[in-house]
């Protein structure tokens, strides 16, 4: 009898619906008109979800979300620019690492791993250093599940006349984002996160004028967003072999997203999942790492048990044997593990996950109190 697919309690890849998986059973010709129409429809819907309007365009890119982050920074940020990077986790640090490799001057503004980036502190940093031209912000820092105040920070950038580039990898589709109203210059996300597609395609939703001004700027051929967009406009095709099955799955996932009720309904389901998870884990003796005011309903970081009998690999394996896949911790200040609340899941799956975790504690002899 075949093994049942595990339920992925991770922030991507994640558990997808049967309809999304079935969409990958068809083969597509990458130059075929039907596939070109698929690309166009997906891009139009992504701009619509972001609240971009006619002033914004979507540029899809093969690869993981980080490919799209590097492509966006390398294309939109001039080499003589200076970027402020609020840093409260591993994915903020990754932006700084990309800028370093690109040779772009940047300033990291440090925050604790459980501290949302402060719009006031960002405003003060911009006031101190007139050379700063851009802010590169992670909306939802997935290393802890920490939500940064995007609207407040966008307002500061607007008031200061600074360009704002947002890594919305783990928030897009789940949390409200109004691109045009916020004045954001670029937003980056990926197929395999809160849209509930499969991994393999990133995308940037970019202010058209900013993209048009970036011709020839990227140091990369494959990661040149301007060239990718210009080629698509001329030919309706991708420059290089596209992830055809990934795009087809994303089209199916977007259809389900709209059928569910769009971002408000998707966000509400994730919030119910998160509340069910946290309540159940607290009943077992676990405590979340973050204060509830800073917690996003996408992934929750829990303190690991203090019992010496606890070791994450054995704990992970026991929960995996029960049919659920956890995510290791990514913090530098505490021993933690993470549990995702996203994917084609509801409260029943979250209760099942809590039961599996409770069973792992019992089988491994781990005391919580």
Swiss-Prot record:
EC number: 2.6.1.37
Pfam families the UniProt entry points to: Aminotran_5 (PF00266)
BP-aspect Gene Ontology terms: organic phosphonate catabolic process
Enzyme class: transferase
Family: Belongs to the class-V pyridoxal-phosphate-dependent aminotransferase family. PhnW subfamily.
Subunit-level organization: Homodimer.
Record's function text: Involved in phosphonate degradation.
Protein name per its UniProtKB record: 2-aminoethylphosphonate--pyruvate transaminase
Species in which this protein is naturally found: Burkholderia pseudomallei (strain 1710b)
